[in-house]
């Protein structure tokens, strides 16, 4: 399994960031590779289950994710039920400057026949994609938030 690990500081209320990220409909807005989110349903344990179409290395993959753990304003974990085998763990923490978001992803590159070199390139692209997504979230959340010294 490939692993990604990113942390970002967002100068916005934690509750605002969590609420935005808890709605899968918002993912394509900040995550260019997430082409579509559909059939979103409430999970009985909190959070949402949803289907998606994702672009990895120019190939489109359809899948579905379900909530594995949902602790409001603290942690949200999803795992795939079909499609790309993955687990996303989002951890939220209040800090003096706003909030810290930690993203940890484990996933299986879905193309076993491409060879090790191509797999390394795809993993680097996905790492870059995750970083861009977090910065897009930061930009989106910091809009209309007063900056205080």
Residue spans for each PLM region:
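Hydrophobic ligand-binding cavity/cleft-lining segments
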Residues: 1-45, 136-139, 147-149
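Beta-strand elements of well-folded, non-transmembrane domains
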Residues: 12, 56-58, 69, 84, ...
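Hydrophobic pocket/interface hotspot
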Residues: 16-21, 27, 50, 67, ...
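A short, structured loop/turn motif at beta-sheet edges
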Residues: 14-15, 42-45, 69-73, 91-100
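Short beta-strand segments that buttress and anchor functional surface loops
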Residues: 50-55, 75-82
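Beta-strand/loop substructures that line and gate deep hydrophobic ligand-binding cavities in soluble
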Residues: 80-132, 148
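Hydrophobic/aromatic beta-strand elements that line small-molecule binding cavities or substrate pockets
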Residues: 6-8, 63-69, 87-94, 105
């Amino acid at each position: 399994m490939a692993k990604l690990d990113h942390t970002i500081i967002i100068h916005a209320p934690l509750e605002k960031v969590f609420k935005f990220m808890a709605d899968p409909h918002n993912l394509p807005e900040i995550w260019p590779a997430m082409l579509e989110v559909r059939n979103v349903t409430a999970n009985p344990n909190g959070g949402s289950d949803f289907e998606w179409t994702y672009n990895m290395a120019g190939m489109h993959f359809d899948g579905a994710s379900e909530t594995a753990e949902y602790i409001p304003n603290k942690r949200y974990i999803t795992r795939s039920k079909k499609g790309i085998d993955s687990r996303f763990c989002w951890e939220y923490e209040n800090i003096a400057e706003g909030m810290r978001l930690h993203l940890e992803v484990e996933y299986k590159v879905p193309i076993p026949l491409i060879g090790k070199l191509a797999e390394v390139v795809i993993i680097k692209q996905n790492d870059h994609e995750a970083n861009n997504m977090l910065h897009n979230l930061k930009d989106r959340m910091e809009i209309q938030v007063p900056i205080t010294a």
